[in-house]
Amino acid sequence: MTATSIRSSLFVRHIALPQDHGSWVFLFSPLLIGLFAAQNFTIASLILVIAVVSAFLLRQPASIAVKARSGRRSSRDLPIARFWFFLYSFVGLVSLGTLIYLGFGYLLYLAIPGVAVFFWHLYLISRRLERRQMGIEIVATGVLALAAPAAYWVGLGHPDPQGWILFGLVWLQSAASIVYAYLRLEHRRLTAPPSFPTAFRIGRRGLLYTTFNTVLVTGLAFTGFLPQLLPLPYVLQWVETIWGTLFQPAVGAKPTAIGIRQLVISTLFTVLFILTWNLS
């Protein structure tokens, strides 16, 4: 067997890489926000990025392996899933060990919730209960939001309470995004645009989340606790939620179109957050 054929047999995209492409933004948004907030990118920051991405990628082959063992996937997927699982684990552990050697051992505390959610996710897969678990997805985005304080602390070289503020701010946005995404997917099942009262009723949770976020951040910015311009990215998400809930429901829209729109809004949020946090 040639090297090319070995690579082609091992690199099976749906096993090696996550297929829910929208999840990438929930990883890189907090990571980039934390890195830019620290305003100091070091070799330790690069190692942290490698460790975080490895941990994120680990979920896909682990999920495939559980599905293969439970009969939901072909048993032929199991060896490939094992290969990627051990590769990501090796890279992640080496990166984590390097961070500990450099004096960032306290980051291990941030990994504890991630380990718990990871095994809970695998349990749900084994029970065939992983689909449409909005609560679990909100908790999972909270775990990914821990990348913000991790990147911030590594950039500073030490823990700082402001890292927890970044974590909370990022998680608020991620949770609202998850709720809104579920609403847009629910719109797809409608045969006609709903009336205004109906649209408000089925979308009130998403409206509540984004309104709460906007009011909270605006109030904290007004008191000087947060940068004055930081409400802008939250206003963006709030306006998008109002528009998509009340005026342009995703009736009959393709999931890909919904995902792309969510990706664009989340990307704009991240860019605006970085700019307003650092320039205010």
Pin down the residues of each PLM region:
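N-terminal signal-anchor module of multipass membrane proteins
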Residues: M1-I50, L57
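Interhelical loop and helix-boundary elements at the membrane-water interface
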Residues: F11-V25, R73-A81, L122-G142, T191-G206, ...
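Core segments of transmembrane alpha-helices
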Residues: V25-L31, Y88-S95, A140-A148, R204-L220, ...
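Helix-coil boundary and interhelical linker segments in multi-pass alpha-helical membrane proteins
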Residues: L32-L48, L96-L110, L146-F167, V217-L230, ...
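Transmembrane helix-loop-helix
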Residues: I43, I47, F83-W120, T210-P249
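Solvent-exposed interhelical
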Residues: K67-F83, L172-T214
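Intramembrane alpha-helical segments
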Residues: L93-T98, Y106, A111-A151
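Hydrophobic, aromatic-enriched interface-forming segments
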Residues: G135-L190
